[in-house]
């Protein structure tokens, strides 16, 4: 990733969208559902003792995980402290689970919960400054044979926005992601997809982006003139029969920590 991410700005933008995220983030919900399906395919059973979720947000993945698996202890981390409030209602419906919330930037935490047999993260790792260091820390915190499943985005993500405005995030290619993962884990599954959404207008695209927080690094104000220029260019470049398109390029990854003594 080029440059360092302004985590304070990311925190504020996502804090503002906590209430609208679940209703607007259809792609991220589909990614979370696929993450759960991957876990079911690669896990030896449906029971996990210690789970860590990185980037819990509004609780979209949290709820799916607790519905799909038997979990003893669940630790959720998010940059936005208010995520704890979103998760509380979910946890109240699962009193059998020992729950802990770990607020703050996961890259800056002095420690990570240890001996996790499952770590999950949905649509979050693209915000990290140093993915390799993070992968190493996660591997060190996991029990041998534990699974780490994550979704993120690859280099063609939101290519329409990048074509007009330039891109604030420089997404890694799937090859780059795979190379980093192989340094610390056995790669069980790594693939990418393309999801195209259709909106009635460029203005609807901007509303969608605003409500999901994926514009979290956008600093330049949207004047009427700038919005008109954006809309005119977007419509001329990316129109289709039903409106205009927006492309997502999700990545799905399942990793296993190598057994002690194995290469």
Curated annotation (Swiss-Prot):
It holds the Pfam family Methyltransf_11. Pathway: Cofactor biosynthesis; biotin biosynthesis. Gene3D superfamilies: Vaccinia Virus protein VP39 (3.40.50.150). Keywords: Biotin biosynthesis, Methyltransferase, S-adenosyl-L-methionine, Transferase. One of its GO terms (molecular function) is carboxyl-O-methyltransferase activity. It catalyses: malonyl-[ACP] + S-adenosyl-L-methionine = malonyl-[ACP] methyl ester + S-adenosyl-L-homocysteine. Coiled coil: none annotated. GO terms for biological process: biotin biosynthetic process; methylation. It comes from the Bacteria. Its EC number is 2.1.1.197. Belongs to the methyltransferase superfamily. Converts the free carboxyl group of a malonyl-thioester to its methyl ester by transfer of a methyl group from S-adenosyl-L-methionine (SAM). It allows to synthesize pimeloyl-ACP via the fatty acid synthetic pathway. This is Malonyl-[acyl-carrier protein] O-methyltransferase. The lineage of its organism: Bacteria, Pseudomonadati, Chlorobiota, Chlorobiia, Chlorobiales.
């Amino acid at each position: 990733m080029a440059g360092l991410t302004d985590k304070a700005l990311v925190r504020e933008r996502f804090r503002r969208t906590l209430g609208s995220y679940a209703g607007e983030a259809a792609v991220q919900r589909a990614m979370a559902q696929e993450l759960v399906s991957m876990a079911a395919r690669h896990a030896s059973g449906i029971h996990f003792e210690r789970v860590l979720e990185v980037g819990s947000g509004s609780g979209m993945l949290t709820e799916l995980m607790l519905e799909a698996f038997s979990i003893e202890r669940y630790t959720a981390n998010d940059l936005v402290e208010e995520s704890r409030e979103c998760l509380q209602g979910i946890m109240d419906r699962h009193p059998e689970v020992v729950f802990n919330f770990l607020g703050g930037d996961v890259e800056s935490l002095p420690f990570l919960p240890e001996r996790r047999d499952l770590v999950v993260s949905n649509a979050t790792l693209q915000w990290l400054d140093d993915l390799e260091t993070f992968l190493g820390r996660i591997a060190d915190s996991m029990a041998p044979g534990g699974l780490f499943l994550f979704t993120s985005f690859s280099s063609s993500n939101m290519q329409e926005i990048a074509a007009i405005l330039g891109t604030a995030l420089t997404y890694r290619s799937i090859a780059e992601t795979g190379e980093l993962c192989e340094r610390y884990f056995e790669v069980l599954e790594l693939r990418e997809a393309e999801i195209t959404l259709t909106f009635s207008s460029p203005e609807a695209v901007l509303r969608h982006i605003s409500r999901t927080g994926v514009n979290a690094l956008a600093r330049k104000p949207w004047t009427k003139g700038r919005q008109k220029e954006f809309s005119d260019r977007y419509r001329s470049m990316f129109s289709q029969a039903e409106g205009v398109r927006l492309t997502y390029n999700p990545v799905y990854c399942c990793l296993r920590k190598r057994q002690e003594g194995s290469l």
